């Protein structure tokens, strides 16, 4: 059976160096406080995890294509919203505080990870997907900017995206997850654009003069 074209990228990263690169990419979405990098890293992680799944487990090519389409559309919505939003996002603390937070989270995860497993996934795949989801949770908790909030929400859906493709490949669950990703991105993009709407100017009160003060009509 010929390999899916989506699996080519997964074949390149299906090794220790590739997995380490993905761990660092997920962490950088929190450390580098920039909405462009948040969107870029989020879409890259969704595409690469889908490709890894295609290379290691060979799901239906149509399922992988729907995952790619959903990730690209969601990323495009967030990117366009960030481009039209002139208000800069204030960083949530400095990078050292965020690094310490990620380090604490990593230590806690290493303590509990041997007891956590996902169906049909190896321990390395489980660790990677859960780490991506945890980085999304940190990004979501630190950000009050809609674009970065959307990136965090999309990262949180990475484990669900993979499980839907493996556990129910023919049920359309992966398509539903993709639709949910697009709706999340659309909601965050709409919120970002709504923040730029000018406030409605108050209408001046209508003053009515008493009958005694009204000017007499001119004949």
Residue ranges and their predicted role:
Residues 1-219:
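Alpha-helical transmembrane segments of multi-pass membrane proteins predominantly involved
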């Amino acid at each position: 059976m010929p390999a899916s074209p989506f699996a080519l990228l997964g074949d390149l990263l299906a090794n220790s160096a590739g997995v380490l690169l993905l761990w660092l990419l997920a962490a950088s979405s929190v450390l580098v406080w920039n909405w462009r990098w948040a969107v870029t890293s989020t879409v890259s992680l969704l595409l690469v995890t889908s490709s890894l799944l295609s290379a290691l487990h060979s799901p239906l090519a149509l399922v992988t294509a729907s995952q790619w389409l959903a990730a690209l559309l969601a990323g495009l919505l967030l990117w366009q919203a960030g481009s039209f939003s002139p208000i800069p996002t204030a960083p949530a603390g400095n990078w050292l505080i965020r690094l310490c937070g990620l380090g604490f989270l990593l230590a806690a995860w290493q303590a509990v990870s041997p007891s956590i497993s996902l169906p049909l996934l190896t321990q390395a795949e489980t660790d990677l997907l859960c780490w991506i989801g945890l980085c999304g949770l940190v990004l979501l908790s630190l950000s009050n900017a809609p674009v970065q909030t959307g990136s965090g929400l999309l990262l949180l859906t990475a484990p669900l995206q993979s499980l839907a493709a493996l556990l129910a490949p023919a049920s359309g669950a992966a398509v539903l997850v993709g639709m949910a990703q697009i709706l999340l991105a659309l909601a965050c993009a709409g919120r970002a654009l709504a923040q730029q709407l000018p406030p409605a100017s108050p209408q001046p009160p209508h003053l009515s003069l008493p009958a005694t003060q009204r000017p007499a009509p001119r004949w």
